[in-house]
Amino acid sequence: MTEQVQANETETPVAVADERIIRETGIDAKVAGIVEPVINTLGFRLVRVRLSGLNGQTLQIMAERPDGTMTVDDCELVSRTVAPVLDVEDPISGKYHLEISSPGIDRPLVRKSDFSDWAGHIAKVETSIVHEGRKKFRGRIVVGEADSVTIESDQISYGNEPVVRIPFDLISDARLVLTDDLIRDALRKDKALREGRIPGDDLGAEPEDVASTETQEKK
């Protein structure tokens, strides 16, 4: 692994005003409760925690900076910091692989601000209960408001309203759909950050770091 970036040692803790509206359940929630304060202290935001049966057991922790970036060095820093905390708390039985990654381009949408930041792009949204006659929605994010998001369908669907307002408290899962427009806009934003047009730091990584990952095995 590369050396820890010195700037990260003095990161400002992330404010919790923009809390996640989509949260984990079960063991994932237990792990999230352990690692989120640690990640915030480093200056990052937790996106998602998921324990899967991939390669035995894999604990995936998605994180990002407040500006949405996440480099390989960032992943390594988070990995080195949360690993000993998880060793002490020991929330998972048996061996597992710890994987720290960025949200990627087709990212999960877990905060109200995510919907506003990616307005104009296509997303898939699921609700915890039936809403407007269904629980699954797909469409362009028209606008993210204080308590809801409006989705305009990008596909012909007979019997369903083309424009639907979905309250945030009903959303159980949401993520962007990978499109050419999304890839172009994500890379444009990444380039702008590197050139200093948008405030940001530690921007020396290549665009591929949008999907960067750091993995280690835990016993």
From Swiss-Prot:
Pfam families in the record: DUF150_C, RimP_N
Keyword Cytoplasm: yes
Location within or outside the cell: Cytoplasm
Ranges for region Disordered: 195-219
A GO BP entry: ribosomal small subunit assembly
Primary subcellular site in the record, as a coarse category: cytoplasm
HAMAP family, per the entry: RimP (MF_01077)
NCBIfam families membership: PRK00092.2-5
Function noted in UniProt: Required for maturation of 30S ribosomal subunits.
Protein name, per record: Ribosome maturation factor RimP
Organism: Brucella abortus (strain 2308)
The encoding gene: rimP
